[in-house]
């Protein structure tokens, strides 16, 4: 059994770690609320854009934009949203597992995959396991802006425009609630038809001013950018929620460990006192 002094040192070490994890839990809770506000503010715009694009995908358009046309799939692209920091439980690895499974399904069909990575954890992971990373952006912090994402989005859209990609997806964690975040893979291009059953039975027609091509070029790019940005802010809220839960679990585990060490410490002290009493009694008997 370890000595009482050594056990006291371990207890002090765990208590110090517990203070750190408790502080990180409180910081994550504060950041999560701010991230949720940002997510809620951007969601109406993203949802409205998705609805309008759903109308376009099911409408009778006078100009058929390339983003609306299905192609033979030879190469797919993924805009992957990961975190820049760790200590957020299985948030990243669960997302990567889902992505790898989807990539394998395409690979089994002879389709190649390109990745545009957002977040340093994703870059590190796919550099180690192997993956064709064609663009990346890291270090966006806790207040990302659309301008931070233009680089990877532009690279993937240019590849799609030039016919080097036939499908484009955004991969991120969807914030459900504080305790639950779901990894999702959402198709961006070609534009998926609306999933609203009511819209499927309607015929949509639009009048464009001044020019359908110029308008759709701008609108559809804004749509892709809005969906990627929404994925980033949802992933950020998911990250802070997962980190808060992970740090709370670490703090609680620290408390349990301290109780166990305190019990061991008490037993060690009891054994030490018993040994001292035995030595005193033995010495007295010898005299």
Curated annotation (Swiss-Prot):
Gene3D superfamilies, sorted: 3.40.1380.10, ATP synthase, gamma subunit, helix hairpin domain
Ranges that cross the membrane: none
InterPro entries: ATP_synth_F1_ATPase_gsu (IPR035968), ATP_synth_F1_gsu (IPR000131), ATP_synth_F1_gsu_CS (IPR023632)
Residue ranges that the Swiss-Prot or TrEMBL entry lists as coiled coil: none
CDD domains listed in its UniProt record: F1-ATPase_gamma
GO molecular-function terms, A-Z: ATP binding; proton-transporting ATP synthase activity, rotational mechanism
Main location: membrane
Subcellular location: Cell inner membrane
Membrane-related topology note: Peripheral membrane protein
Alphabetic keyword roster: ATP synthesis, Cell inner membrane, Cell membrane, CF(1), Hydrogen ion transport, Ion transport, Membrane, Transport
Cellular component aspect of the GO annotation: plasma membrane; proton-transporting ATP synthase complex
Superkingdom of the organism of origin: Bacteria
One Pfam family this sequence matches: ATP-synt
GO term, biological process aspect, one: proton motive force-driven plasma membrane ATP synthesis
NCBIfam families (UniProt xref): ATPsyn_F1gamma, PRK05621.1-1
Family: Belongs to the ATPase gamma chain family.
HAMAP family linked: ATP_synth_gamma_bact (MF_00815)
Assembly behavior: F-type ATPases have 2 components, CF(1) - the catalytic core - and CF(0) - the membrane proton channel. CF(1) has five subunits: alpha(3), beta(3), gamma(1), delta(1), epsilon(1). CF(0) has three main subunits: a, b and c.
Function, as annotated: Produces ATP from ADP in the presence of a proton gradient across the membrane. The gamma chain is believed to be important in regulating ATPase activity and the flow of protons through the CF(0) complex.
Protein's name in the database: ATP synthase gamma chain
Organism: Cronobacter sakazakii (strain ATCC BAA-894)
């Amino acid at each position: 059994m370890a000595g009482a002094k050594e056990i006291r040192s371990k207890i002090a070490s765990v208590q110090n770690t517990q203070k750190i994890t408790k502080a990180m839990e409180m910081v994550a809770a504060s950041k999560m609320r701010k991230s949720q506000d940002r997510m809620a503010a951007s969601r109406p715009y993203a949802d409205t854009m998705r609805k309008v694009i759903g109308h376009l995908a099911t409408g009778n358009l006078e100009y058929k934009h390339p983003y609306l046309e299905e192609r033979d799939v030879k190469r797919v692209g993924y805009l992957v949203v990961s975190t820049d920091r760790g200590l957020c439980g299985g948030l990243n690895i669960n997302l990567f597992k889902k992505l790898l499974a989807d990539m394998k399904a395409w690979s089994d069909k002879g389709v190649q995959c390109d990745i545009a990575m957002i977040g340093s954890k994703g870059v590190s992971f796919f550099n180690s396991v192997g993956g064709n990373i064609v663009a990346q952006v890291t270090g966006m912090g806790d207040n990302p802006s659309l301008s931070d994402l233009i680089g990877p989005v532009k690279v993937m859209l240019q590849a799609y425009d030039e016919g080097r990609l036939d499908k484009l997806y955004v991969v991120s964690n969807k914030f459900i609630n504080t305790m639950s975040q779901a990894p999702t893979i959402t198709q961006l291009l070609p534009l998926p038809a609306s999933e609203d059953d009511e819209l499927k039975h309607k015929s949509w027609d639009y009048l464009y001013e001044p020019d359908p091509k110029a308008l759709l070029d701008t609108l559809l790019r804004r749509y892709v950018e809005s969906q990627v940005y929404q994925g980033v802010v949802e992933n950020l809220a998911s990250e802070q929620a997962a980190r808060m839960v992970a740090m709370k679990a670490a703090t609680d585990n620290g408390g349990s460990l301290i109780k166990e060490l305190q019990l061991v410490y008490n037993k060690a002290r009891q054994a030490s006192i018993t040994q001292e009493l035995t030595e005193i009694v033995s010495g007295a008997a010898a005299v």
